[in-house]
């Protein structure tokens, strides 16, 4: 049986599953939306009986299929027993974001026909919790725009099916917008000198040289970076040794535009020299 890369995209309605599927299609995956979970084994069986150069597949499966929740566990287990390896990506967003998105699109939530929107959202969370618990990756899209979500999903899809190296995501954020869900390590850099209070730097970001110089050249920053890099050098290989596939390192300042962005860039460059699968994103830089 030829080794296939199979990605299952699922999660809460309105959390960005269609955007995620489009991202993988742009990355070269053969994509199917709303495939009944019971048809997945037959689809893969036919694929292995066919001469084809297509080896990467992505499927969106969710509550639009009435029997999805009752069937997915047995189907996924049977596929694993047959030797298939697949990755489940579960997308979610906070309630306020989902409500806003539904208000903007004027679409009906699949579980809100006889209930209010908020009740439908909460019921879906409850129903999908067993699937969320077995997902390989949980992505909170609450504070991601379309381009950021696409980039994140494509980064995941670009990895090899058999990961020999841990995938590390370095993320800058602003504490005023909340700590990123799913972050494994959170570093608060609000103790560093703040460029926000320097008039000529206030409207710049940590991607620009004047801000980077202001933040990174301070003695306290240099001392902090040395200690933080030592900690990461100690922890990351041990996470990998324990079989952890993903590690998210979140660096936060007040607004997520200056200090955290500058420091996250240094952390990214450092880790990129040690691990093959490292990505960098700035959650709140455009706020």
Curated annotation (Swiss-Prot):
| Binding-site residues for GTP, renumbered to this chain | 62-65
Give GO MF terms, alphabetically: ATP binding; GTP binding
Question: Binding of ATP: at which residues?
Answer: 11-18
Name the keywords, alphabetized: ATP-binding, GTP-binding, Nucleotide-binding
Pfam family example for this protein? PapZ_C
Would the keyword Nucleotide-binding turn up in this protein's UniProt record? yes
**What InterPro entries does the database record attribute to this sequence?**
P-loop_NTPase (IPR027417), RapZ-like (IPR005337), RapZ-like_N (IPR053930), RapZ_C (IPR053931)
Task: Supply the PANTHER family for this chain.
Answer: RNASE ADAPTER PROTEIN RAPZ
Family that this chain belongs to: Belongs to the RapZ-like family.
Q: Name the NCBIfam families for this protein.
A: PRK05416.1
Q: Give the protein's function.
A: Displays ATPase and GTPase activities.
Its name, as the record gives it, is Nucleotide-binding protein Dalk_1358
**Whose protein is this, by species?**
Desulfatibacillum aliphaticivorans
């Amino acid at each position: 049986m030829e080794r296939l890369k199979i990605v299952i995209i699922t999660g809460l309605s309105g959390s960005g599953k269609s955007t995620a599927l489009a991202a993988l299609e742009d990355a070269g995956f053969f994509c199917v939306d709303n495939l009944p979970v019971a048809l997945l084994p037959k689809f893969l069986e036919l694929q292995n009986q066919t001469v084809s150069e297509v080896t990467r597949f992505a499927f969106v499966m969710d509550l639009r299929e009435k029997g999805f929740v009752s069937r997915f566990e047995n189907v996924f287990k049977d596929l694993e027993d047959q030797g298939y390896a697949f990755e489940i990506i579960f997308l979610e967003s906070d309630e306020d974001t989902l409500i806003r998105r539904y208000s903007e699109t004027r679409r009906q939530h699949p579980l809100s026909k006889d209930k209010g929107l908020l009740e439908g959202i909460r019921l879906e969370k409850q129903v999908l919790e067993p699937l969320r618990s077995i997902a390989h990756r949980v992505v909170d899209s609450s504070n991601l725009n379309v381009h950021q979500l696409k980039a994140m999903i494509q980064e995941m899809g670009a990895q090899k099916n058999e990961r020999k190296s841990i995938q590390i995501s370095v993320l800058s954020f602003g504490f005023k917008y909340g700590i990123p869900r799913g972050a494994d390590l959170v570093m608060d850099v609000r103790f560093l000198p703040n460029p926000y209070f320097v008039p000529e730097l206030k409207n710049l970001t940590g991607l620009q040289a004047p801000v980077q110089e202001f933040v990174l050249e301070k003695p306290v920053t240099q001392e902090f970076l040395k200690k933080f890099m030592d900690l990461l050098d100690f922890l990351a290989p041990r996470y990998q040794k324990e079989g952890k596939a993903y590690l998210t390192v979140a660096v936060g300042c007040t607004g997520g535009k200056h200090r955290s962005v500058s420091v996250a860039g240094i952390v990214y460059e450092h880790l990129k020299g040690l691990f093959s699968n490292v990505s960098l994103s700035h959650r709140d830089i455009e706020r």
